[in-house]
């Protein structure tokens, strides 16, 4: 895999910030918001846009994207090819390249160190706002239904 210290750190940051934690979380929130703003029940929106993500990730983890596509419905797969590029157009890749440059140049690290030195007020504010977002409130309610005593 060629895991060299600084390269691994850069890859990790890009993957986490742009794809896994940044991109995926925003996609789930936007999907949830789109459905609820259109009048769909929040619980159903949560299941469709957040809860089912684990199923898809598990399918990809165990067999790759093509294997996942062989398991999901033809309708879902067609939507992947038809709607996916409309939701995430190719210019997203250009923005990821810009983000990678900020990581590689040390700008991201500098910005984070400045934020941390101030007590991380922006991070704490974003964390607080997310905790009050309906997707988190509904998610807590849904997850509590699955808790085993």
Regions found by a protein language model. Name each.
Residues 42, 48-55, 63-64:
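Small-residue-rich helix-loop
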Residues 37-38, 63-123:
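Interdomain hinge/lid region at the active-site interface
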Residues 116-149:
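N-terminal charge/polar-biased segments
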Residues 1-10:
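Single conserved hydrophobic/aromatic residue that forms the stacking wall/gate
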Residues 34-44:
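Inter-helical turn/loop segments and adjacent helix faces that build the functional surface
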Residues 14-22:
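A short glycine-threonine-serine/GTX helix/turn-capping micro-motif
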